[in-house]
């Protein structure tokens, strides 16, 4: 279903930080994370506990409620270790693979669009996504109340601890433990920092487990009156136990899967980023008296790639040290310059410029690739030697070996050999390797290509 206009405005507003997320077990159900909802996990763990002689049939009044199972085991053994170890190990919580929703959530945290995420889950899928994108210096991860002193401006909070907690007794499975930690540690921070965002979305809350319902009610009670709350769930509103428990108005219910929700949010954000990139290209054309190039197809290709892949593409093109490069106004001119140059090359050569997810650009004619390039910007301060060294270092990471690099945004004068390699698609054979060795890639500056259309026709034959 379409997202509410207020939510679309919040995700695209300048400055960001207007949205906070509260995530439940339903967010980890989608593949490849593939962790079942709490009721399924609880029922299976209860079966194992009975089979292993730790519980007897009937000792737990509700085997589908993980809190009830934990309470039953705690009453018998004064410990919840038997529940925690089975939950952690059977479902691979430490090494959970991020699904698309988690990748997008990590990107939106990194971008500063989402100010905070509070997760009620124990798996580390979202932490893994943040790490893989290189967000460690920007996004704080608060796994326990003791970590609150290390929080950053943007944070991921594990309200119930997570699979990294070495002591199984510290996992918040029972409502008594939740209330103790909430009043003693979480309440002032969550209320003043996390839930102060103008918009809070509860997503994937899933099965109405006692500790989850209690957590959600505590979070709801801490919301400022001006905060707009939404509940996203894939099911029918009449069957949403959390919707009933929170006594919400039907207008705030969003019927959506977790990944679908994040895709819709990120699509609106990316539309804004692409629009600003197009505007930057217009300014660049006017300021430098360049030909009016048609970059609509290239911008459309970026929109179709999605926010995570576009962030990775920015990192490739700007020679960034991390896997993901956030959107910033100060690099728009650099990116626009590269896109305009690609459009010029396509127009002059009569070939189609196709952006590849790994950062390369292929020029195709009649369905055949006639040239393949790395794209590299000096970011306005790197000279030829620095760019060349960085390009050579990165060339082995591409899915297919490019034969040359297109370079822009450099700090000094640039000269390139006038003769391109014999085969612009495959490159030249190394004289030092009986196979095809690491010969230096030719570098072509986009300024030189703009001034010499004959060179364009050579490099895109």
Question: What kind of feature is each model-predicted range?
Answer:
Residues 134-195:
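Active-site gating loop/helix substructures
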């Amino acid at each position: 279903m379409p997202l509410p206009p207020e939510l679309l405005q919040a995700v695209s507003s300048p400055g960001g930080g207007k949205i906070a997320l509260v995530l439940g077990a339903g967010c980890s159900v989608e593949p490849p994370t593939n962790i079942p909802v709490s009721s399924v996990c609880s029922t299976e763990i209860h079966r194992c506990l009975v089979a292993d002689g730790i519980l007897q049939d009937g000792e737990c009044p509700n085997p589908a409620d993980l809190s009830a199972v934990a309470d039953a085991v705690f009453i018998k053994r004064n410990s919840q270790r038997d529940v925690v170890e089975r939950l952690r190990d059977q479902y691979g919580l430490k090494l959970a693979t991020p699904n698309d929703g988690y990748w997008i959530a990590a990107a939106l945290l990194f971008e500063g669009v989402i100010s905070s995420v509070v997760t009620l889950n124990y798996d580390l899928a979202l932490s893994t996504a943040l790490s893989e994108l290189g967000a460690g210096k920007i996004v704080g991860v608060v796994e326990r109340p003791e970590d609150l002193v290390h929080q950053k401006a943007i944070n991921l909070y594990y309200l119930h601890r997570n699979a990294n907690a070495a002591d199984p007794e510290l996992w918040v499975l029972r409502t008594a433990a939740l209330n103790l930690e909430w009043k003693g540690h979480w309440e002032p921070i969550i209320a003043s920092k996390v839930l102060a965002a103008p918009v809070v979305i509860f997503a994937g809350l899933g099965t109405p487990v006692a500790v989850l319902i209690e957590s959600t009610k505590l979070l709801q009670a801490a919301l400022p009156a001006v905060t707009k709350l939404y509940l996203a769930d894939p099911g029918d509103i009449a069957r949403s136990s959390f919707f009933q428990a929170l006594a919400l108005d039907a207008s705030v219910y969003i019927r959506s899967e977790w990944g679908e929700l994040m895709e819709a949010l990120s699509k609106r954000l990316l539309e804004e980023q692409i629009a600003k990139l197009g505007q930057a290209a217009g300014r660049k054309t006017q300021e430098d008296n360049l030909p009016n190039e048609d970059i609509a197809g290239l911008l459309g290709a970026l929109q179709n790639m999605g926010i995570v892949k576009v962030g990775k593409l920015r990192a490739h093109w700007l020679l960034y040290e991390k896997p993901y490069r956030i959107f910033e106004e100060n690099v728009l001119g650099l990116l626009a310059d590269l896109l305009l140059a690609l459009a010029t090359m396509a127009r002059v050569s009569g070939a189609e410029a196709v952006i590849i997810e790994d950062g390369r650009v292929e020029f195709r004619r009649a369905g055949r690739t006639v040239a393949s390039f790395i794209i590299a910007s000096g970011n306005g301060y790197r000279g030829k030697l620095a760019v060349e060294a960085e390009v050579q270092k990165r060339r082995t990471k591409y899915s297919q070996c490019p034969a040359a690099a297109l370079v822009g945004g450099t700090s000094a004068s640039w000269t390139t050999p006038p003769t391109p390699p014999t085969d612009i698609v495959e490159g030249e054979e190394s004289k030092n390797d009986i196979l095809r060795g690491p010969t230096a890639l030719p570098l072509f500056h986009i300024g030189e290509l703009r001034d010499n259309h004959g060179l364009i026709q050579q490099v895109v034959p």
